[in-house]
Amino acid sequence: GYKTKYMANEIKSVEYGLEKIFEGAQDFLPLLGTDYVEFIVGNAKQAAHYYKTAFGFQSVAYAGLETGLRDRASYVLKQDKIRFVFTTPLTADSPLNDHIVKHGDGVKVVALWVEDARKSFEETTKRGAKVYMEPTVETDEFGEVVRAGIYTYGETVHMFVERKNYNGTFLPGYKEWKSDYNPAPTGLKYVDHMVGNVGWNEMNTWVKWYEDVMGFVNFLSFDDKQITTEYSALMSKVMSNGNGRIKFPINEPAEGKKKSQIEEYLDFYGGAGVQHIAIATDDIITTVSDLKSRGVEFLSQPPQAYYDAVPARLGAHKDCLLYTSDAA
C-alpha cells in the first residue's frame, strides 16, 4: 500500500481541556466548545437522512408544524460531540428563503457553548459586534436556555448558547426525534475547526475582528507561496480562542494563473461564508473506509511525491512526531 505520514503535536491533540493554551488570547467570554452548526437547506428532511445514512449521525430532536412551529422545520442530528441542525423554511415570506436563493444550501449559524450567554453578548457587542439576536430566555418543562447572537463574516451568525439550567434533548421548542432508522456512527468525534472564506483583502479585517471582538489569537498563518497549486492560490490565518476548542481559519483569494479557489467559492456561494467544517476522528483510516463504503466521495489520492515531500515541508520541528503507516 502507499505510505501515509501523520503529524501530531499539542495543537492537534484529540481532547482539549479548558485551560489556556494560547497565551495571546484574551478569553473574556470564555468558550466551552461548539454547541451546534445550523445549515439552511432546501430540504431539511432529505439532508438529515443523507447525514444519517452516509456519515452515521443519530436522530436527536425535531421542530416544525407538529411542534407548533409554523414557519420552518428543523432536524437535529448528533454524533459524539457534533451537533448539526438542518432547517428549511415552510412559508413563502420567510427570510430564510432569501438565504437559500442567494447561497443555496449553506451554514447560517455557528453556535458556541458558553457559561453565560448574556455576558458573551455584552462583551462582544461593546467591542463592535453587530447584533443578530438580543439575549433571549427559552423555557420548557426541562428548564431554560439563554441564547444571544452576533453577525460575523457575510450573513454568518455566532449564537451564544447557555444551557447550564437545561436537561432537554436540544432546545426548548424541540421534541425528541425517535427514529427506527439508526445507522451506526463512523467515528466522527468533534468539530476540529471551521473555515471562513472572505473577499479580496478582507482576511486581515476579519482576523482583527476575531482578535478585538472575540478575544481570539492568530496562532498560524499561510501565505500564497505556502498554499498554492500551478493555477490557484490563497492566503489563510488561523484564529483560536484561549483553550483551543474553537479554531476558525480565515481565507482570502490570492493571485494565480487562474481564478483562486476562494474566489470561485465567493462567486458560487454569493459572498463570504463557511467553506468547510473539519471533523476529528481517532482513526482516520477506519473512518474514511467506512464513509467510502457508504457512498461518500473523497478527493483522489495525491501522488507519492506528495508524501515523500512531507519531511522537507515540516523541517526539524521539535513538536512534530512523524511515523509511517501502510494503508490499503
Where are these regions (language model features)?
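An N-terminus-focused feature that recognizes amino-terminal "leader" regions
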Residues: 8-153, 161
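Short, structured motif recognition centered on aromatic/hydrophobic residues
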Residues: 34-38, 57, 84-86, 107-110, ...
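Short, Lys/Arg-enriched N-terminal segments with co-localized hydrophobic residues
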Residues: 1-6
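A cross-kingdom feature marking solvent-exposed beta-strand/loop segments within repeated
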Residues: 62-73, 90-109, 118, 127, ...
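Extended intrinsically disordered, low-complexity coil regions enriched in Ser, Thr, Gly, Ala
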Residues: 45-60, 118-132, 202-204, 208, ...
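Extended catalytic-interface subdomain
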Residues: 107-109, 132-226, 237
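N-terminal beta-strand motif that seeds the catalytic metal site of vicinal oxygen chelate
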Residues: 8-45, 107-110, 169-207, 270-279
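Conserved small/polar residues in nucleotide/adenosyl-binding loops
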Residues: 323-328
